[in-house]
Amino acid sequence: MAALGSSSQNVTEYVVRVPKNTAKRYNIMAFNAADKVNFATWNQARLERDLSNKKIYQEEEMPESGAGSEFNRKLREEARRKKYGIVLKEFRPEDQPWLLRVNGKSGRKFKGIKKGGVTENTAYYIFTQCADGAFEAFPVQNWYNFTPLARHRTLTAEEAEEEWERRNKVLNHFSIMQQRRLKDQDQDEDEEEKEKRSRKKPSELRIHDLEDDLEMSSDASDASGEEGSRTSKAKKKAPVTKAGRKKKKKKGSDDEAFEDSDDGDFEGQEVDYMSDGSSSSPDETEGKPKVPQQEDGPKGVDEQSESSEESEEEKPPEEDKEEEEEKKAPTPQEKKRRKDSSDDSDSSEESDIDSETSSALFMAKKKTPPKRERKPSGGSSKGTSRPGTPSAEAASTSSTLRAAASKLEQGKRTSETPAAKRLRMDTGPQSLSGKSTPSSGDVQVTEDAVRRYLTRKPMTTKDLLKKFQTKKTGLSSEQTVNVLAQILKRLNPERKMIGDKMHFSLKE
């Protein structure tokens, strides 16, 4: 450049030549300043391409003809790519990263990744000075950022899993030791508290350790004393009501029912609440005298005796004397019946049904008009009320009738046969009391019935016994089992073990 005006500055001119066609391509290697790269210490350097990603871009090699080939496979693959807009990238070695190894195997390793978009809006040139003093400018093609690779060997999947298990063991060990320390601390604190208690003055010494129990027992005794005084006052003011006695009776009868009952005993009673005909209207209940509502379920001998005791209080002393004379005889028999009822729940239910039917027959003979008859529902008598459920008329009848009915029932019980049972249960719906009893003719243990059940699906003996319940058939449990065994021998059904249980089935 020439000097400008009168300025005395010396300017040196350089010639820069830009070659049009060059075989060489220049790239820039960028290192991070934190890596502290010093080229003066490099004795040996090796640079090579990382071609490990070549497998990703390669297509599966399939034979075009012969065994294993597909017709027009390439054409169909191209059509699929066009349909979904898939553009395959070609594997270009110049786009792959560089691997730089310095000073042999023991030296450092660097990986250079190509930085895209560097030469889009800018142009970088490398100037080299020639022997004649002129500079040659070469454009930069690519820019690579080099980062050091980790020297340590990475773990494989199996090694990583082993290390993870070891870590869990170590953490568990630490947690266990921490728990032991906490326990030891708690024990030390407890021992210190005991020592402090033992060091107290002798005036504070107490013989009984359970202070809370003593306080609770004293409170309970005070409360029981107050309750006793209240009950004595209540007895002086008014006589004991029936409701209070009925609650006590319910507790005892509930316990007995739950102890003696078996699976499926009360399955036949599930339909009892479906009909509304047996439920009396509120107007009728207002007109009637209040009768205690007894619990649902079979009525035992204890309940009959208690209900008779209730009726004693309402009667004049003349009837009390007559009833006492009649009651003296059946007391040992009642004890015997209690033992029988605890042995077999099914037989107890059947005996209760028989007792009710016999009492109903006796009432029909005496022709004692009930206070008010309950209208049974329009359906069958079986669905309206449970067997053994006491009605309002049964509660209001005289005790003499009850005692005579219990005698009659005890006499019949000794010589009880299945045929007599059926006859008595069939005559039950004809009673004047309006009480409904289940008829024995509804379900019968027959060969056709068993065959019908077994052709539907495989069943166990327990399932068959549930189908033929004692309430429906009128037979005892032992008789039902014997009849079923004989029918199964005649039918000779197929036997299969399903879930560790023997199932019987028949084919049509």
UniProtKB/Swiss-Prot annotation:
Residues 255-270, 303-325, 343-355 have a biased composition (Acidic residues). The modification Phosphothreonine is found at residues 156, 331, 389, 437. Residues 378-388, 428-443 have a biased composition (Polar residues). Keywords: Acetylation, DNA-binding, Nucleus, Phosphoprotein, Transcription, Transcription regulation. One of its GO terms (molecular function) is RNA polymerase II general transcription initiation factor activity. It comes from the Eukaryota. It is found in: Nucleus. The modification Phosphoserine is found at residues 217-218, 221, 224, 377, 380-381, 385, 391, 431, 433, 436, 440. Residues 389-406 have a biased composition (Low complexity). The keyword ATP-binding does not apply. CDD domains: TFIIFa (cd00240). The keyword Acetylation applies. Residues 177-446 are annotated as: Disordered. The modification N6-acetyllysine is found at residue 407. The modification N-acetylalanine is found at residue 2. GO terms for cellular component: cell junction; transcription factor TFIID complex; transcription factor TFIIF complex. One of its GO terms (biological process) is positive regulation of transcription by RNA polymerase II. It holds the Pfam family TFIIF_alpha. Residues 232-251, 364-374 have a biased composition (Basic residues). Phosphorylated on Ser and other residues by TAF1 and casein kinase II-like kinases. PANTHER family: GENERAL TRANSCRIPTION FACTOR IIF SUBUNIT 1 (PTHR13011:SF0), TFIIF-ALPHA (PTHR13011). Belongs to the TFIIF alpha subunit family. Heterodimer of an alpha and a beta subunit. Interacts with GTF2F2, CTDP1, TAF6/TAFII80 and URI1. Interacts with GTF2B (via C-terminus and preferentially via acetylated form); this interaction prevents binding of GTF2B to GTF2F2. This is General transcription factor IIF subunit 1. It comes from Mus musculus.
